[in-house]
Swiss-Prot record:
Zn(2+) binds at H143, H147, H153. Ca(2+) 1 binds at E10, D94, C198, N201. Gene3D superfamilies: Collagenase (Catalytic Domain), Disintegrin domain. Its main location: secreted. PROSITE patterns: ADAM_MEPRO, DISINTEGRIN_1, DISINTEGRIN_2, ZINC_PROTEASE. Glycosylated; glycans contain fucose, galactosamine, glucosamine, galactose, and mannose. Sialylated; 75% of the hemorrhagic activity of native bilitoxin-1 is lost upon removal of the sialic acid moieties of bilitoxin-1. Its EC number is 3.4.24.-. This is Zinc metalloproteinase-disintegrin bilitoxin-1. The disintegrin belongs to the long disintegrin subfamily. Disulfide bonds join C118-C198, C158-C182, C160-C165, C214-C233, C225-C243, C227-C238, C237-C260, C251-C257, C256-C281, C269-C288. One of its GO terms (molecular function) is metal ion binding. Belongs to the venom metalloproteinase (M12B) family. P-II subfamily. P-IIc sub-subfamily. Expressed by the venom gland.
Length: 291
């Protein structure tokens, strides 16, 4: 079995009543915005080998199911308790974020528990819908999820190549999609020290609620493969432009498979040892025959 460097965050989003009202109850419009936010999240997290899969959206159309307060810490704690007691029984997920139209005190636009990823009570965040610009809100969500992944705020010694890094304490007027060197180190330390298990499993394509996006590195309904952008695709069997396997593909893995084709008949695939005479490919299968 090949080593898979990727981690997978199965994300559940809750839209509070104020945000539903802000969009005049147009849930389709909110969904479209959410799908765009998640696409940006995947762009941001791809360099860290993290894929974000949206596995659920809940709209609080009639009333909020928690007390959404302008004190961000109070709202975060209330949302965490609701999520722990209600959501696991309904939807398998790794992390939940509350999208809200409330204006938090002291200029706060989001909050999250540090290193909370995979914790039953702490794998949550809150994000204020503070801008009409998708990138601004997506970066805020990436920032809060970053806290869940063990990242702290950047200081003056942190850099991401001259850009305004994601984990700065305050959102820049010219935000970028880049994490700093400090964030990379803190994330690595979190993975090494906390060993969060919930982000190791790849979600099923049928669990993902957002429309399939060819090129996002996540296998979704209707796709035969998805190896990311064409320039980054490492899968020789996959047509990155269509997310379909090439018509000539015979195999993808196996002792008798090479570059998506069966190895020629007679090719040695298992050395002779003791009573085992070894094995040779048939030219018709990716598996090495067992005598």
């Amino acid at each position: 079995q090949r080593y898979n460097p990727y981690k997978y965050i199965e994300l559940f989003l809750v839209v509070d009543n104020r945000m539903v009202t802000k969009y005049n109850g147009d849930l389709d419009k909110i969904k479209t915005r959410i799908y765009e936010l998640v696409n940006i999240l995947n762009e941001i997290y791809r360099p860290l080998y993290i894929r974000v899969a949206l596995v659920g959206i809940e709209f609080w159309c009639n009333k909020d199911l928690i007390n959404v307060k302008s004190a961000s810490s109070v709202t975060l704690a209330s949302f965490a308790n609701w999520r722990e007691s209600v959501l696991p029984n309904r939807t398998s997920h790794d992390n939940a974020q509350l999208l809200t139209a409330i204006v938090f005190n002291r200029g706060v636009i989001g909050s999250a528990y540090p290193a909370g990823m995979c914790d039953p009570n702490r794998s949550v965040g809150t994000v204020q819908d503070h801008s009409e610009i998708n990138l601004q809100v997506a970066i805020t969500m990436a920032h809060e999820i970053g806290h869940n992944l063990g990242m702290g705020h950047d200081n003056n010694s942190c850099t991401c190549g001259g850009y305004s890094c994601i984990m700065l304490p305050a959102l820049s007027d010219q935000p970028s999609k880049y994490f700093s060197n400090c964030s990379y180190i803190q994330y690595r330390d979190f993975i090494m020290n906390q060993d969060p298990q919930c982000i190791l499993n790849e979600p099923s394509g049928t669990d993902i609620v957002s429309p399939p996006v060819c090129g996002n590195d996540i296998l979704e309904v209707g796709e035969e493969c998805d190896c990311g952008c064409p320039r980054n695709c490492q899968d020789p069997c996959c047509n990155a432009a269509t997310c379909k396997k090439y018509s000539w593909v015979q195999c993808e893995s196996g002792e008798c498979c090479d570059q998506c084709r069966f190895k020629g008949a007679g090719t040695e695939c298992r050395r002779a040892m003791g009573d085992d005479p070894g094995g040779r490919c048939t030219g018709q299968s990716a598996d090495c025959p067992r005598n």
